[in-house]
């Protein structure tokens, strides 16, 4: 104890943050007491704080928080109150802190992903932050009577607002004081200054509640002034006499003086209690008030003496130090008090007693623990120097250091972020204050404490600069006049206030009275009651908190469990797949092996049969040769029989082979793309012998197979049918069918039946014996006769064979016929018995008829008569029906014969009619050709160096003079022409007349159009010129064109102008890249310049080329005003205003000249386009209207336009029907809808494929002559001299092992023969299956990963994972913390964790662990340095250390340090002994060992220094043989053979305590250990080098060794190998080598694909190879396409352009690329041709090379062959090639299914299929089956077309509508498509599913 009566606690262990089980208790907390001195405090701002102040603030932020109390939840304790209590020390004003206050703070090291466990918040503390500005959130005010922690910020404003609050109950007994937030600023108690000469004016009165501006907060919202935040409120009267909340009373300012004898340390009931305020105390002030001046002399200024004993409030205050930057006001927590300031005579408030002196101490600051009686006062010392800190024991200091959290490598104390934020509560019931002596039994009403503000005030920091003077103000503001609002200065501080002398005197008197009356209180009684009340309140508050937190925990648990269940459900699915995957794979493999075995058996069986057939044929030939050479007739007959037998056997074998090889039974059907997929088996073909080759039953009869009929039975049936037909024709009656005789069986008794059966058996046996004897006798006689006739040398053979055959026949009869005969006999017996029974019944009726002569007989007679009449009527009806059927059959036969004759006559007529139509068209073309001279224009610019095409034949033009006389009338009615008997001259004259009329009509139409424009010109609407009469003129390049046209382009312009002059439409079919766009623009420029025709012109183009057209027109003819007609509906509505003006004159000043739009918008806005009269309509990429059935074709045909121009580089894409549609579009009057002409044009040329004949030369010439005038086509090699030919190379690739496995698996799952047979029959149901199969095979050829991608594999993670932060929201740098947590958590209560629950952790409640640690590890440990030093002399225990080169301190550290610390220290040691072995390597020094290392034998012989001499070269390999051998073995680079099935983070303790979080972070993220394992970072090493730090000061090098496995590393996550991804595909491997070569040579590549999924995979490959690329496919937006093409054209660093063949092959210019690669080819050659011409076009200066990757021996070879055939058709038709064009392999459209099926077969199978098909065709069965199939309507599968399969998810590039539009042509007669579109019941306009043929036609581009 010191002289003031304080118990010294310097040696007591202070509680620390991190101590387990250490719930902060007042009795166990160390306290240092300082003398209170007078200091002048000056206000400082944050920026002006001294270093010591800041350090003090940080160091004392959590001085009272224990390690386990970081989550301070409750201060309730059931332990008995301690008799001893030490008051807390006060920190010095300068911010000096004590060592025992340097406790650890909470570390909020929780990542974004892993929020920490929320601790139970203290109901009496507020959430706080470490910043001195403001709190995290408003905190819950402490309940009445409970201490509240200070403000979150380190300002006194928050302290006073909370501590000086009225209405709080008195401080009661408690086991532990209220906890303080670890981040609260230190509560320092400052002795006030000694200046007493300054007068303080009284403060101005304030309203009860008023908001004020707080400059320290970041909000503009005014805060409410709490009653506790009033000026002058002190700890003494903070809670005294609390008025009702919200109605505070005004206070009277006062000043007082006091002598030293008033500080007698008596307790409450001791009778000598004095004021607890020391003489040197300043009165604490509100943060709203200014610093008060010192009172004048004579006032109650406290003398400069220390009190003998601190007041109970001081002793029971918190240990938190005051922030040195505060106002100097006391931050001691408020305690309940019933004292109130004196007031003028008025009724006392309800919260005070009725004693004479309301300031008595009967209810002031009771403690929860009754303190002992204070001792007598010691002499008062006026001023005493500050007590210095006492040094704590070493153990305590070490424990404190251990309790700190390792934030970085050096542990630093940081302010703790308290995440526990409370909501303020209004406590409904509070303990009543104890009555005074006069009114002990009068209960005081309970009052609710006022709400407190939790925000800090920066004004406190500012007020520190003003001198302070302690003043005490009563909580009761009972001034007679209300206080006015305080005036504020400019900086937000209130103006200073002064006290009146009268008020100070009143206060002095009142306080003296209080001190005198305080001795009569009974402390024991008072404390007991208050203690119980507070305990009861704590229990109530805790129960409420438990309920609240229970709800939150339940919600959190429900969410957690739901997530677990979802996760386990997903994992269960994965486990199921993993468990049964191997089983399924094993089963599939077994089936595959079985199927392969069966297929091999079938092949062996086939080879054996073929060999047997060959041997049999050889035997036949030999037998025939012997028969010819035989002289004897018998021998010759024998040889002939042998030959016949051999021939029959060969025929049977041949039939078996023709039926096909029966494949193995398959239970697994392939279905790789979804949808239903049939399986075709050869068994179906065999079952088809019963009638239908398809093997399908016709009716719903027996489910089993039909009985097979022999060939003889079939022939007999056929003969009988022919005989019956002949009899019918001759009028004879057919013979009646033989009926089985009815045998009546009479029922007998059992005895008779038994007798009869015995007789029957005997007779039957006898009969059989007789029959057998007769037969054998006859047969013997016959055999004998035959044997006699046969030569002797052949008798022995014939008899034996005959007997065998005879026996075989009888065996067959016994096996087959006996059972049937028995069944027939049984049936006949049953029928016989039934008839006999009926006969008996009838006989009995007849016998009794005389007895039944009544009315009933009459009725029966009538019924029988009616029945007889009905039977007769039925008989005659049947008879008449049969006669009628016979008559109809005869009439039908006659009609059929007449139809055949009529068909023959009609065929001849149609032939002449077709000839007439062709002649008419030829004449028209001849007349037009002479005017337009297309042939001259086409070849006038040919390169003379290029030889004439070898296939080009001389066209023999028609030598016909153009008639000059009057034009004969047009023959429109073909019925007037006699095609049967009319002369050829008359037909020719009619054809010439029609041709002339067609020309005249075209010209008249143009003149009418122009004249109409002239007529309308008068009204000011249109202004068209009439250039028709200008004739043939040679024109020059228009000056409006800002470019120089080439010669061939100028010729093309002349041709187009001549077409326009004649009013004829045309097709500009120049090869792609020759400038069709420029030529069409030049025509419009010519019309504008020469004839002042400025439009309107309409350009319709695909959506991808709209921007290109707009740019080209603006570039070449800037004077044209372009209307870009695209966009949304609202945008187009605005654009249409340009042509909706009725009085628009299309001159140069017109609103627009050229309208550019797309095909889709033309169809959607057809009504608006048809209103306009277009001068010229240009259709770019005219193959978009190649189908005359499409809606766009008919919509464009109905537009009002003078001329039409079609631009296409590929006029023929798939068949001639497309070219017919284009010609019909440009000349509807000539190429009209005559079916004969269309059929000849489209089908007759291709029909030769059925018979594999060659095209007729005359027909080809006539076809070319028809096309010549209307179509102008030039090719690049003829007109473009500087553009060389493109080089096309086919690169054949082989299937890899994985691809072969996939391919063979697919082949084994299907039966090619069945597919072909069903496809030949035209079964639509199987067309989807065929297309699906084609897609699967093409996927295999491209890459097997298209079926199944190799995914990233990892063990099953038994852990929780937090959500990953969004890189889009957070940026590139995202803080990713440790968030993995095990699914298994060890729940541990907080009390067990902290309060001695862990016995191995030392703490206040676990003294055993502390005693063990101190005793065993320190006192009784022999490894202490002192003991080692004492035992090192002589031969004592540790004398060996001097030979082991170990000091006592090193030995102590080795036994007391952790393993990682020792390992790091060993790593830092320099191996001096090993290097000595290197230095002293001579023989004489080999055994040299220093004296201090005699026992270190192993380090002396260490070879590691030798191995570490060098790290490279041969010497390094010699010194590290084992490591080099391991590296060369490649074991570290192999794929891991296995991986763990599951992984999980360590199981952790789950405790609602910050201490557990600290320990976890200490274990998992220990900064020193991480630094030791991983070493310095790259940035640190750079800094060390730049700073030139000495090597001995460098940190420890990395201790973590490199992983043994290079690929695996330290993780179990396996990433798929990209190298394997490349080598799994033969195509990709070839492409990899090719791209490497092209890149090195500086080429740029266009890479085309058919499948968008393959483009996705190719992007991964290009990223892997670091090739720069860009991509364009059907899903690319319109605006992005333009930018992508521009980037590739302008940025040479882009190496590859990935394109979809359909999307990237139209209308874009990519001339910067010189290499084109087709990863997979299209079966339409024009699509590929368009794609490669993106680079091979005008502007290309390099040699263009085209590579085509084809997989050898697969379906791709056959698709390529088919494309080449189509290419040849185009060349022949368009260029007029020679007549030797072989169309072998071509198929009619209806046989396209068969072509696709043939692609799936190999060469051997294809040959067999051809042979089988030929046999079926010869036998006529094929036609029968096709007729049967045609009679059935089958519902088409709604499956996707091949085109859609290729480009799934890509979208339609040209945005065209593909709906079938009803009629094919505008003819009057309805076509089948028309009738189909209407459907039944008038369902017009409904969407009908396309048939498989239509889908195939779409895939080939034949229709839309």
From Swiss-Prot:
One GO CC term on file: Ino80 complex
EC number: 3.6.4.-
Short sequence motif DEAQ box: positions: 1180-1183
Quaternary organization: Component of the INO80 chromatin-remodeling complex.
Role: ATPase component of the INO80 complex which remodels chromatin by shifting nucleosomes and is involved in DNA repair.
Domain notes: The DBINO region is involved in binding to DNA.
Protein name: Chromatin-remodeling ATPase INO80
Organism of derivation: Gibberella zeae (strain ATCC MYA-4620 / CBS 123657 / FGSC 9075 / NRRL 31084 / PH-1)
């Amino acid at each position: 104890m010191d002289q003031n009566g304080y118990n010294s606690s310097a040696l007591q262990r202070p509680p620390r943050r991190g101590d387990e089980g250490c719930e902060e208790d007042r009795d166990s907390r160390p306290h240092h007491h300082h003398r209170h001195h007078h200091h002048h405090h000056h206000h400082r701002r944050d920026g002006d704080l001294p270093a010591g102040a800041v350090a003090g603030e940080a160091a004392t932020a959590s001085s009272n928080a224990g390690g386990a109390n970081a989550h301070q939840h409750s201060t309730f304790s059931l332990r008995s109150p301690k008799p001893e209590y030490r008051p807390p020390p006060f920190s010095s004003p300068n911010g000096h802190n004590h060592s025992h206050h340097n406790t650890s703070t909470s570390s909020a090291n929780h990542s974004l992903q892993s929020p920490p466990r929320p601790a139970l918040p203290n109901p009496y503390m507020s959430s706080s932050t470490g910043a001195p500005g403001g709190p995290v959130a408003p905190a819950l005010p402490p309940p009445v009577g409970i201490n509240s922690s200070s403000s979150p910020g380190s300002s006194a404003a928050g302290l006073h607002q909370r501590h000086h609050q009225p209405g709080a109950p008195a401080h009661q007994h408690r086991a532990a004081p209220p906890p303080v937030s670890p981040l609260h600023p230190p509560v320092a108690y400052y002795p006030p200054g000694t200046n007493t000469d300054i007068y303080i004016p009284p403060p101005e009165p304030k309203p009860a509640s008023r908001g004020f501006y707080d400059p320290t907060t970041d909000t503009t919202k005014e805060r409410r002034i709490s009653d506790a935040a009033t000026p002058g409120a002190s700890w003494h009267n903070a809670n005294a006499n609390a008025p009702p909340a919200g109605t505070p009373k005004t206070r009277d300012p006062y000043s007082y003086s006091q002598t030293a004898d008033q500080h007698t340390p008596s307790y409450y009931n001791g009778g000598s209690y004095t004021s607890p305020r020391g003489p040197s105390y300043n009165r604490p002030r509100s943060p709203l008030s200014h610093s008060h001046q010192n009172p004048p002399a004579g006032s109650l200024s406290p003398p400069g003496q220390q009190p003998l004993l601190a007041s109970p409030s001081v002793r029971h205050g918190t240990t938190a130090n005051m922030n040195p930057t505060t106002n100097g006001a006391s931050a001691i927590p408020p305690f309940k008090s019933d004292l109130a300031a004196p007031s003028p005579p008025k009724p006392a408030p309800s919260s005070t007693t009725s004693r004479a002196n309301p300031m008595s101490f009967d209810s002031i600051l009771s403690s929860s623990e009754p303190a002992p009686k204070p001792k007598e006062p010691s002499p008062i010392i006026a001023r005493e120097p500050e007590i210095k800190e006492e040094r704590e024991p070493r153990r305590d200091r070490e424990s404190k250091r251990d309790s700190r959290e390792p934030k970085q490598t050096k542990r630093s104390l940081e302010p703790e972020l308290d995440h526990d934020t409370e909501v303020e509560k209004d406590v409904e019931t509070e303990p009543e204050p104890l009555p005074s002596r006069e009114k002990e039994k009068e209960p005081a009403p309970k009052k609710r404490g006022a709400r407190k503000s939790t925000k800090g005030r920066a004004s406190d920091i500012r007020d520190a600069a003003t001198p302070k003077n302690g003043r005490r103000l009563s909580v009761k503001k009972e001034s007679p006049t209300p206080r006015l609002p305080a005036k504020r200065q400019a900086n937000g501080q209130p103006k200073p206030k002064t006290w009146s002398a009268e008020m100070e005197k009143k206060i002095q008197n009142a306080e003296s009275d209080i001190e005198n009356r305080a001795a009569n209180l009974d402390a024991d009684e008072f404390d007991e009651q208050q203690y119980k009340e507070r305990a009861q309140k704590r229990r109530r508050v805790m129960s409420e908190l438990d309920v609240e937190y229970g709800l939150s925990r339940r919600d959190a648990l429900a969410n957690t469990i739901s997530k677990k269940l979802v996760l386990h459900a997903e994992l269960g699915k994965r486990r199921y797949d993993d468990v049964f995957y191997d089983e399924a794979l094993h089963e599939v493999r077994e089936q595959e092996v079985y199927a392969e075995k069966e297929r091999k058996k079938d092949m062996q069986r086939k080879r054996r049969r073929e060999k047997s057939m060959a041997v049999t044929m050889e035997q036949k030939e030999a037998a025939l040769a012997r028969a010819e050479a035989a002289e004897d007739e018998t021998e010759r007959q024998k040889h002939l029989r042998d030959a016949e037998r051999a021939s029959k056997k060969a025929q049977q074998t041949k039939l078996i082979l023709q039926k096909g090889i029966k494949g193995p039974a398959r239970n697994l059907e392939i279905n790789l793309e979804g949808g239903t997929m049939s399986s075709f088996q050869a068994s179906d073909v065999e079952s088809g012998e019963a009638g239908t080759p398809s093997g399908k039953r016709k009716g719903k009869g027996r489910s089993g197979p039909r009985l097979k009929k022999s060939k003889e039975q079939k022939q007999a049936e056929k003969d009988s049918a022919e005989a019956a037909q002949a009899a019918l024709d001759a009028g004879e009656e057919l013979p009646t069918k033989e009926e089985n005789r009815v045998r009546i069986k009479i029922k007998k008794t059992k005895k008779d039946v038994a007798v009869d059966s015995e007789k029957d058996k005997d007779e039957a046996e006898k009969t059989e014996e007789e029959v057998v004897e007769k037969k054998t006798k006859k047969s013997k006689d016959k055999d004998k006769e035959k044997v006699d006739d046969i030569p002797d040398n052949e008798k022995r053979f014939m008899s034996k064979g005959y007997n065998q055959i005879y026996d075989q026949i009888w065996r067959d009869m016994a096996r087959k016929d006996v059972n049937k005969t028995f069944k027939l006999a049984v049936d006949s017996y049953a029928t016989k018995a039934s008839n006999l029974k009926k006969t008996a019944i009838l006989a009995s009726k007849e016998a009794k008829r005389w007895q039944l002569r009544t009315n009933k007989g009459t009725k029966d007679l009538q019924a029988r008569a009616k029945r007889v009449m009905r039977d007769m009527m039925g008989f005659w009806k049947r008879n008449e029906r049969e006669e009628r059927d016979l008559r109809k059959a005869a009439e039908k036969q006659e009609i059929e014969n007449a139809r055949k004759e009529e068909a023959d006559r009609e065929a001849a007529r149609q032939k002449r009619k077709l000839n007439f139509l062709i002649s008419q068209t030829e004449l028209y073309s001849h007349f037009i050709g002479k005017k337009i001279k297309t042939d001259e224009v086409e070849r006038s610019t040919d390169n003379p160096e290029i030889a004439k095409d070898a296939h080009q034949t001389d066209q023999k033009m028609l030598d016909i003079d153009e008639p000059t006389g009057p034009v004969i009338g047009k023959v429109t009615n073909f019925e007037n022409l006699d095609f049967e008997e009319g002369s050829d001259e008359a037909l020719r004259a009619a054809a010439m007349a029609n041709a002339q009329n067609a020309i005249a009509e075209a010209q008249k139409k143009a003149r009418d159009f122009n004249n109409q424009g002239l007529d309308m010109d008068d009204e000011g609407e249109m202004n068209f010129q009439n250039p028709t009469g200008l004739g043939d003129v040679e024109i020059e390049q228009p000056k409006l064109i800002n470019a120089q046209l080439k010669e061939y382009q100028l010729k093309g312009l002349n041709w187009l102008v001549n077409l326009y002059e004649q009013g004829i439409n045309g097709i500009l079919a120049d090869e792609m890249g020759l400038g069709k766009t420029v030529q069409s623009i030049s025509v419009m420029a010519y019309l504008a310049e020469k004839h002042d025709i400025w439009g309107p012109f309409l350009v319709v183009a695909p959506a991808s080329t709209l921007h290109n057209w707009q740019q080209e027109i603006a570039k070449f003819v800037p004077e044209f005003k372009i209307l870009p007609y695209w966009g949304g509906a609202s945008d187009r509505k605005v654009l249409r205003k340009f042509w909706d003006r009725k009085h628009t004159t299309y001159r140069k000043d017109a609103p627009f000249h050229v309208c550019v739009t797309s095909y889709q918008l033309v169809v959607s806005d057809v009504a608006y386009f048809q209103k306009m009269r277009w001068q010229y309509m240009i259709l770019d990429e005219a193959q978009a209207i190649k189908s005359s059935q499409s809606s766009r074709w008919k919509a464009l045909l109905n537009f009002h336009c003078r001329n039409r121009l079609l631009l296409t580089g590929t006029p023929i894409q798939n068949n001639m029907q497309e070219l017919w549609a284009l010609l019909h579009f440009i000349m509807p009057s000539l190429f009209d809808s005559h079916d004969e002409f269309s059929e000849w044009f489209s089908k007759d040329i291709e029909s030769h494929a059925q018979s594999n004949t060659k095209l007729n030369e005359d027909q080809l010439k006539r076809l070319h002559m028809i096309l010549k005038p209307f179509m102008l086509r030039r090719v690049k090699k003829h007109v473009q001299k500087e553009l060389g030919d493109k080089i096309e190379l086919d690169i054949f690739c082989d299937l890899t092992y994985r691809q072969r496995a996939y391919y063979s698996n697919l082949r084994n799952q299907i039966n090619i023969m069945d597919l072909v047979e069903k496809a030949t029959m035209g079964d639509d149901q199987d067309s989807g299956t065929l297309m699906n199969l084609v897609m699967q095979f093409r996927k295999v050829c491209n890459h097997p990963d298209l079926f199944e991608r190799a995914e990233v594999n990892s063990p099953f993670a038994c852990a929780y994972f937090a959500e990953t932060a969004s890189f889009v929201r957070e940026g590139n740098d995202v803080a990713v913390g440790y968030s993995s947590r095990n699914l298994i958590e060890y729940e541990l209560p907080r009390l067990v964790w902290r309060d001695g629950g862990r016995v191995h952790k030392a703490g206040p409640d676990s003294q055993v662990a502390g005693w063990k640690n101190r005793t065993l590890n320190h006192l009784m440990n022999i490894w202490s340095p002192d003991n080692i030093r004492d035992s090192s002399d002589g031969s004592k225990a540790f004398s060996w250390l001097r030979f082991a080169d170990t000091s006592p301190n090193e030995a102590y550290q080795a036994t007391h340090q952790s393993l990682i610390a020792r390992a790091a220290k060993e790593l830092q040691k320099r191996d001096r002994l090993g290097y000595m072995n290197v230095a002293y390597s001579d023989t004489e020094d080999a055994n040299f060992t220093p004296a201090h290392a005699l026992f270190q034998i192993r380090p002396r012989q260490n070879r590691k220094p030798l191995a570490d001499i060098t790290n490279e070269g041969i010497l390094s390999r010699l010194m590290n043989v084992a490591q080099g051998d391991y590296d060369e073995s490649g074991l570290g680079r192999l794929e891991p053979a296995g991986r763990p099935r599951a992984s999980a983070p360590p199981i952790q303790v789950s405790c609602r305590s910050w201490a557990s979080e600290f320990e976890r972070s200490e274990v998992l993220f220990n900064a020193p250990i991480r630094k030791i394992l991983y070493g310095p970072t790259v940035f640190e090493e750079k800094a060390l080098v730049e700073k030139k730090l000495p090597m001995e000061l460098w940190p420890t090098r990395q201790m973590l060794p490199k992983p043994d496995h290079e690929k695996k590393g330290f993780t179990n996550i396996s990433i798929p190998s990209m190298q394997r991804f490349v080598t799994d595909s033969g195509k990709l491997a070839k492409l990899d080598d090719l791209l490497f070569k092209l890149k090195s040579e500086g080429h740029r590549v266009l890479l085309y694909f058919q499948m968008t999924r393959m483009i996705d995979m190719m992007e991964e490959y290009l990223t892997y190879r670091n090739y720069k690329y860009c991509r364009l496919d059907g899903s690319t937006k319109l605006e992005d396409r333009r930018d992508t093409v521009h980037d590739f054209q302008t940025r040479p660093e882009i190496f590859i352009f990935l394109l979809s063949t359909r999307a990237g092959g139209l209308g874009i210019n990519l001339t910067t690329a010189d290499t084109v690669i087709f990863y997979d080819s299209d079966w339409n050659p024009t699509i590929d041709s368009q794609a490669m011409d993106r680079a091979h076009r005008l502007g290309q200066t390099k040699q263009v090379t085209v590579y085509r990757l084809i997989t050898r021996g697969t379906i791709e070879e056959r698709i390529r062959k088919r494309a080449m055939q189509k290419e040849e058709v185009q060349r022949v038709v368009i260029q007029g090639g020679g007549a030797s064009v072989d169309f072998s392999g071509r198929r009619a459209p209806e046989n396209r299914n068969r072509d696709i099926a043939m692609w799936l077969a190999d060469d051997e199978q294809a040959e067999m299929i051809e042979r089988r098909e030929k046999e079926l065709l010869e036998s006529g069965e094929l036609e029968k089956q096709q007729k049967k199939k045609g009679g059935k309507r089958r519902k088409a599968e709604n499956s996707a077309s091949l085109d859609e399969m290729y480009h799934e998810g890509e979208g339609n590039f040209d945005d065209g509508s593909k709906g079938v539009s009803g009629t094919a042509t505008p003819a009057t007669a309805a076509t089948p498509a028309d009738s189909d579109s209407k459907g039944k019941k008038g369902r017009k306009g409904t969407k009908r599913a396309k048939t498989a043929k239509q889908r195939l036609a779409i895939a080939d581009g034949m229709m839309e």
